[in-house]
Design a protein with these regions (language model features):
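Mg2+-dependent phosphoryl-transfer active-site scaffold
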Residues: 65-314, 355-356, 365, 383-603
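Substrate-recognition/cap helix-loop segment adjacent to the acidic, metal-dependent catalytic center
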Residues: 1-12, 155, 164-166, 170, ...
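Acidic, Mg2+-coordinating catalytic module of metal-dependent nucleases/exonucleases
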Residues: 1-2, 25-82
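Helix-rich "cap/lid" substructures immediately adjacent to catalytic or cofactor-binding pockets
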Residues: 324-367
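Conserved beta-strand -> loop -> alpha-helix junction used to position metal-binding or nucleic-acid-contacting
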Residues: 8-21, 77, 101, 144
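Catalytic DNA-binding helix-loop module of base-excision-repair DNA glycosylases/AP lyases
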Residues: 1, 358-360, 371-383
């Protein structure tokens, strides 16, 4: 009305529903009468606009008192306070819109990761949501596009917002998007618009906004699959999720440049080339070449004096077992290994050593899994019980040593023998495993120490890791669950059956193969922890989330599948197993120390 009369009308407005949701999170439902009863407001004649306005005003007065108690005394402070309260309350935006975020440099990449983390941890409601205030705070280094028909701008155009409002909305974005008519033809089918001409007018409106605001307009495909014939896989997957419109044709395939130019020829030849080629290239040229994760570069956390402690511990144990004058074979082996480890991977070794030692102190053996047994340093540090030296005799009293390389497969295969120096029975040891099995030739492979803890003790081991490195630096290793062949086969069979489609075995196998491997859910490694250096954030490497999108979970996992980061971050593989538990029980029952039992004991 004011607009028609030429009267400026730009009042400050407050949304009482948002106040109620964030200040009264315990309610759960926020109908006017429910909130009024909770606030003990006088009875009113509900559903009459004039009567409803009175309790809303009374609510606002009470909400202002609540805000004053939180230190909010100015209108300008309210939005920030609502953002702080939202994670504690309903954590949702009632009508979230789609948006495109492109990281153009490393700063933008970290901001993108931080937004993804926040959307999953703080604002998740059925889907991850990013409040606009968070987006503005993390905008540096990002290119923001207006997205598809579910974007804020396109929805405003469909809703026939006035021109000034459209300009206000469009001005927020770095570039505006238009898409092929087929992407939005569902609007014709559901009666939102009359025909394709209305869809063309929507795109023309976006182009006009771009021209008036000086914003580039880019033609995009909203691509969901590669080739047109791949659309059937999307139908099958949507049908498995019970979507009512699973079979509606939506040609979201990767179009060629010529196909895109033809799609937008109604804009004129020059304008079509501008939106399809010129502007999209201009956006792409703003994006730097970004290395997501530096290949082969480990960013280990810090443990105080880890290098000195490991070096001292290893040589001390070597002298304790093999004498003051160490055999040259042992000296050479330790020098080679320590040369590859110290200054690079010493934290990996010392963190494992501390975890194993704590478990042993609590009475639980730890099984070392994988190739760590090929490291003599790991043996000397007490991480593994596997001695990688060639088969040999070692006197536990006078420390005399006899090597028998090549004669036996391992020390346990050698016959018993007495020490010729002091007459004590020799200990038999050595499994003859080259160090390269663990760190590769030249020591260039990032070490991966896998440990099997007692299932009873595993949670305490994880807590010890958090204690060592800090709660904000330790995360569960994330996993991605994909569609298995048997499940995909079931989806295909049900889809064909429900749609009355006859197909031979070859066609069923083809459709199944097209669905296999599609991401289905996220999870967590049963024992994997990822540790970030204390001078860095997890978002320097990847975002984080709750497993399986469960907002009620206390666990925070890496958003990326952990294997892609194992060369960059320390991963503690700490599985829970029954064997250490059973060994402890047997020790308690028999009084026999399991570590004292010879490997060649016939009993």
């Amino acid at each position: 009305g004011c607009k028609k009369c030429g009267i400026p009308f730009e009042p400050t407005y407050l949304d009482s529903l948002i106040f109620a949701q964030n200040l009264l999170p315990e309610l759960g439902k926020y109908k006017l009468d429910i909130v009024a009863d909770h606030l003990q407001l006088p009875q009113f004649n509900h559903h009459r606009a004039s009567d409803d306005a009175v309790p809303v005003a009374q609510m606002l007065a009470k909400f202002f008192v609540m805000l004053e108690e939180r230190g909010v005394t100015r209108l300008q402070q309210i939005n920030d306070e609502m953002t702080k309260l939202r994670p504690l309350g309903v954590k949702r935006n009632r009508f979230p819109k789609h948006i495109i975020l492109i990281a153009k440099n490393k700063v933008g990449l970290k901001n993108l990761y931080q937004l993804i983390s926040a959307s999953n941890l703080k604002y998740f409601k059925r889907v991850p949501i990013i409040p606009k205030s968070e987006l503005v705070a993390h905008r540096e280094g990002l290119i923001i596009g207006s997205a598809c028909e579910a974007g804020e701008l396109f929805r405003a155009i469909v809703d026939h917002k006035d021109w000034n409002e459209l300009k206000r909305i469009a001005s927020f974005y770095d570039y505006l998007e238009i898409q092929p008519l087929g992407n939005n033809r569902f609007m014709v089918r559901d009666g939102t618009v009359r025909d394709d001409e209305d869809l063309k007018d929507f795109n023309r409106t976006v182009v006009k906004l771009g021209e008036e605001l000086g914003k580039p307009v880019c033609a995009t495909g909203d691509v969901h699959f590669l080739d047109p014939e791949d659309e059937v896989y999307r139908h099958i997957l949507l049908a498995s999720k019970k979507f009512a419109d699973a079979n509606e044709p939506v040609p979201l395939y990767f179009r060629t440049t010529d196909e895109m130019l033809k799609e937008f020829d109604y804009l004129g030849k020059e304008k079509a080339y501008e939106v399809v080629v010129t502007n999209t290239r201009a956006i792409a040229e703003q994006v730097e070449d970004i290395e997501l994760l530096p290949k082969g570069k480990l960013f280990p956390p810090r443990l105080e004096n880890s290098e000195e402690d490991l070096n001292r511990m290893v040589w001390g144990k070597a002298h304790e077992l093999y004498g003051d004058d160490l055999p040259q074979l042992i000296v050479d082996r330790l020098n080679v290994e320590l040369g590859s480890i110290l200054g690079k991977y010493d934290v990996v070794y010392m963190s494992a050593q501390k975890l194993v030692q704590r478990s042993l102190e609590c009475g639980y053996l730890v099984g070392s899994r994988g190739s760590v047994g090929s490291s003599l340093v790991a043996y000397m540090a007490g991480i593994t019980e596997v001695n990688a030296l060639p088969p040999h005799y070692r006197c536990p009293k006078c420390r005399n040593v006899e090597f028998h390389a090549g004669e036996y497969g391992c020390g346990a295969d050698m016959p018993d023998k007495m020490c010729p120096v002091c007459g004590t029975k020799y200990a038999k040891d050595g499994f003859d495993i080259p160090f390269e099995t663990f760190l590769g030739y030249g020591g260039g492979k990032v070490p991966d120490i896998d440990l099997n803890f007692s299932g009873e003790y595993q949670a305490r081991a994880h807590a010890h890791a958090v204690e060592m490195f800090g709660k904000t630096q330790v995360f569960r290793a994330g996993t991605i669950g994909t569609l298995a062949e048997k499940t995909a086969y079931g989806f295909v069979k049900k889809y064909l059956e429900e749609n009355g489609i006859a197909a031979g075995n070859a066609e069923i196998d083809r459709l199944t193969a097209g669905c296999v491997g599609v991401r289905r859910t996220t999870g967590q490694h049963p024992g994997g922890l990822v540790v970030v250096p204390d001078d860095m954030d997890i978002e320097d490497f990847c975002p984080v989330q709750h497993p399986a999108d469960d907002p009620d979970s206390d666990t925070i996992t890496t958003h990326f599948e952990y294997h892609c980061m194992e060369d960059n971050l320390l991963k503690l593989d700490m599985l829970g197993h029954d064997d250490p538990t059973m060994i402890r029980m047997l020790e308690n029952l028999t009084g026999v120390n399991a570590r004292a039992i010879p490997l060649d004991d016939p009993d």
